[in-house]
């Protein structure tokens, strides 16, 4: 007969047992059961002692840059252009602008991100007295905002005459009239030396849309915008520099020709460059990383893609500030099938991240993310952040138009950068290198070997609702695991207090919806 113990001694008796579940190294012992991916395991729950709202997701994405939501959008031409990059940054993540376009077009997208939100705007668009109403309307259409200061010479450090707002020009019929005929001259200004906090307070109380900062001679030296003040209130997690500009990243290839592209991106205000290649351990990438670090020391470099410690060591030694992990795991990628090269994502993320952490280099788990749980698993295995392609491709902010599928569903086009559709598309790359062909070392091949496919993804609405769902979901997951931030998650995994369990095929079936005649899978409400 089994002895029934005193229930008050339960915690004491528990000490007689080894920890439930598996240590991460046992879980990922490929000698025992082969390499794993995200669906092959679960994280065991811990103890909840705090609300989910107290969970911090702040993380480093490179050596120098920190973001508050560990989410990045992929540099694919059906995922990230300026609209996606702006909104990812506003929501605490980071968008990486694709390079399958002419350099000037990509630089213009970077410029739009950097101009979207500011503290003191040090390089505002300034009009001269000769600028016409029509020209002001064109500038508003180009940049997506109105409210342009007018100075005597049409430049900064020239005497301020007035401000032209969207309301001033919206219904003005004569496009040939000078802006001086419609501009506002009853301005509230602040003197040089005013702090940002003081200037924001003046802006709040003035009820004006813009606050020009002027020197003792009345010359314009910078500008503050009410819309930026409102963005600070509405987007508290925004990824920003101390100057209050949004953080911006963009991709380039490993080709020497892209050194010119890089210069244009830097001139536009780029913060982080992603050297984009399907196989990052190449002499071309190593040379490009060294070139960037030598010539642009203020720009952080993310190298990749890689899946082994050996690849990681080469890029870290070259000076990479961050690493992108994943080869053949993306939803639109067929590299593993066609090239017989790659690695299951869970094994790759753990191996590379554990090694890179010894050098203080953050890693990004790129590919294989099919749902919210996969994001958490990538982070638990050591990634500082997770990069998404197909999960974001169907959102309002991704490039392209919605269309109706043959099944009557609203969808958007989505294609892997290794697909023939990208490699043969000359409409985006223009006269420059095709980014898809460059990424897969195929630009000079007579026969293009596809490493990706083209298709469509279902409408996911706006990322202004979708990304907050992902953030809240990760917070609740960490609460279930019993850790309050990502550093604690990684520390718990490394020291064995955060435990794992393998999943059989039957366990995976059990852990999904089953046994219902019909069901509706609604992921979130807001």
From Swiss-Prot:
Required cofactor names: K(+)
Protein name listed in UniProt: Inosine-5'-monophosphate dehydrogenase
Active site feature: 333, 439
UniProt binding sites for IMP: 331, 366-368, 389-390, 451
GO cellular component: cytoplasm
Source organism (scientific name): Penicillium roqueforti (strain FM164)
Disruption phenotype: Increases the sensitivity of P.roqueforti towards MPA and decreases MPA production by the fungus.
EC number: 1.1.1.205
The reaction(s) this protein catalyses: IMP + NAD(+) + H2O = XMP + NADH + H(+)
Pfam families named among the record's database cross-references: CBS, IMPDH
Keywords for this protein: CBS domain, Cytoplasm, GMP biosynthesis, Metal-binding, NAD, Oxidoreductase, Potassium, Purine biosynthesis
Gene: mpaF
UniProt domain CBS: residue ranges: 120-179, 183-239
């Amino acid at each position: 007969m089994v002895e029934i113990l005193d229930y008050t001694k339960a915690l004491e008796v528990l000490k007689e047992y080894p920890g439930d579940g598996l240590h991460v190294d046992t879980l990922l012992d490929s000698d025992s059961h082969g390499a794993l991916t995200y669906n092959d395991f679960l994280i065991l729950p811990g103890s909840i002692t705090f609300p989910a709202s107290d969970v911090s997701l702040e993380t480093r994405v490179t050596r120098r840059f920190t973001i508050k939501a560990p989410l990045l959008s992929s540099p694919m031409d059906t995922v990230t252009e300026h609209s996606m990059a702006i909104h990812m940054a506003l929501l605490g993540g980071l968008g990486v602008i694709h390079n399958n376009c002419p350099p000037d077009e990509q630089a213009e997208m970077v410029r739009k991100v950097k101009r979207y939100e500011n503290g003191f705007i040090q390089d505002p668009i300034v009009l001269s007295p000769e600028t016409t109403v029509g020209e002001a309307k064109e500038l508003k259409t180009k940049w997506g905002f109105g409210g342009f200061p007018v100075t005597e010479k049409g430049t900064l450090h020239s005497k301020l005459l007035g401000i032209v707002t969207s309301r001033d020009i919206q219904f003005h019929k004569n496009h040939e009239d000078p802006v001086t005929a419609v501009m506002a001259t009853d301005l509230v200004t602040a003197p040089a030396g005013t702090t940002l906090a003081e200037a924001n307070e003046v802006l709040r109380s003035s009820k004006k849309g813009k606050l020009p900062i002027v020197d003792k001679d009345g010359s314009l030296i910078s500008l503050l915008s009410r819309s930026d003040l409102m963005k600070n209130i509405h987007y508290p997690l925004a990824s920003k520099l101390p100057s209050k500009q949004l953080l911006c990243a963009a991709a380039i290839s490993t080709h020497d020709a892209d050194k010119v592209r890089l210069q244009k991106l830097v001139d536009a205000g780029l913060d982080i460059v992603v050297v984009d290649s399907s196989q990052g351990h190449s002499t071309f990438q190593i040379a490009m990383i060294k070139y960037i670090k030598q010539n642009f020391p203020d720009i952080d470099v993310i190298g990749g893609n890689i899946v082994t410690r050996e690849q990681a060591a080469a890029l870290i030694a070259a000076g990479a500030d961050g690493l992108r992990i994943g080869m053949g795991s993306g939803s639109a990628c067929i590299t593993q099938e066609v090239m017989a090269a790659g690695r299951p994502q869970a094994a790759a993320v753990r191996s590379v991240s554990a090694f890179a952490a010894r050098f203080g280099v953050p890693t990004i788990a790129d590919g294989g993310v099919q749902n919210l749980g996969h994001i958490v698993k990538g982070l638990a295995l050591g990634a500082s952040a997770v990069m998404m392609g197909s999960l974001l491709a169907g959102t309002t902010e991704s490039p392209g138009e919605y269309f109706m599928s043959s099944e009557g569903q609203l969808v958007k086009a989505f294609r892997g950068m290794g697909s023939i559709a990208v490699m043969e598309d000359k409409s985006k790359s223009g006269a420059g290198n095709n980014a898809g062909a460059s990424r897969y070392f195929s630009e000079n091949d007579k026969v293009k070997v596809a490493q990706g496919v083209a298709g469509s993804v279902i409408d996911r609405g706006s990322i202004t609702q979708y990304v907050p769902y992902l953030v809240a979901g990760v917070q609740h997951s960490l609460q279930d695991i019993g850790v309050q931030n990502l550093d604690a998650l990684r520390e718990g995994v490394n020291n064995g207090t955060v435990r794992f369990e393998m999943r059989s095929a039957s366990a995976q079936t059990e852990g999904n919806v089953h046994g219902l005649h019909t069901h509706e899978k609604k992921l979130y409400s807001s």
